[in-house]
């Protein structure tokens, strides 16, 4: 008798909903609505989405206007890097200041967190808006000081513009 009372709670409406595959019909209706909407797919090589001025891409080392390297070999970026991707060696100049002799970034280790850029007291290391680069071998993504300076020299106007646009938020 108790079994009959328990099955009585299952109504005829519920039976038709389950028998007629109501959930399947609702799912197909939802799929149909999205089928005829405007597509949001970006055809990447031809179309590009706008980048934020804070986008963190390929690293670069900057120079002062007189051509001197900005890096003072304080090694803060090396110390703060959570991935241990930065290696710095330095020498003392005749005037007592330090300058880097070796500044390497292993991009296979780098997580592009931006801590190196934030910790730099002279804005020497920056992350550029460049995200289209690749390496065919593991060593291709190991950037030396000369390579980083070349990137900085080539993209200095863009880097300076991004820094200026972001200055009021820092």
Curated annotation (Swiss-Prot):
- Which residues are [4Fe-4S] cluster 2-binding? 81, 110, 113, 116
Class of the enzyme per the UniProt entry, highest EC level: translocase
Which residues hold [4Fe-4S] cluster 1? 71, 74, 77, 120
Q: Which key words are in the record?
A: 4Fe-4S, Cell inner membrane, Cell membrane, Iron, Iron-sulfur, Membrane, Metal-binding, NAD, Quinone, Repeat, Translocase, Ubiquinone
The residue stretches assigned to a coiled coil in this entry are none
Q: One GO molecular function term? A: NADH:ubiquinone reductase (non-electrogenic) activity
Q: Which GO terms describe its cellular component?
A: plasma membrane
What does the record say about how the cofactor binds?
Binds 2 [4Fe-4S] clusters per subunit.
Needs which cofactor? [4Fe-4S] cluster
Q: PROSITE patterns under this entry?
A: 4FE4S_FER_1, 4FE4S_FER_2
Q: Does the keyword Nuclease apply?
A: no
EC annotation? 7.1.1.-
Q: Which Pfam families match?
A: Fer4_7
Q: Which GO terms describe its biological process?
A: aerobic respiration
Looking at the record, the residues that make up the 4Fe-4S ferredoxin-type domain are: 62-91, 101-130
Keyword Transferase among UniProt keywords: no
Q: Which reaction is the catalytic activity of this chain? A: a quinone + NADH + 5 H(+)(in) = a quinol + NAD(+) + 4 H(+)(out)
What is the role of the protein in this entry?
NDH-1 shuttles electrons from NADH, via FMN and iron-sulfur (Fe-S) centers, to quinones in the respiratory chain. The immediate electron acceptor for the enzyme in this species is believed to be ubiquinone. Couples the redox reaction to proton translocation (for every two electrons transferred, four hydrogen ions are translocated across the cytoplasmic membrane), and thus conserves the redox energy in a proton gradient.
State how it assembles.
Answer: NDH-1 is composed of 14 different subunits. Subunits NuoA, H, J, K, L, M, N constitute the membrane sector of the complex.
Q: What HAMAP family is this protein classified in?
A: NDH1_NuoI (MF_01351)
Which family is this sequence assigned to? Belongs to the complex I 23 kDa subunit family.
Query: What is the protein name for this chain?
Result: NADH-quinone oxidoreductase subunit I
Organism, as annotated: Acidovorax sp. (strain JS42)
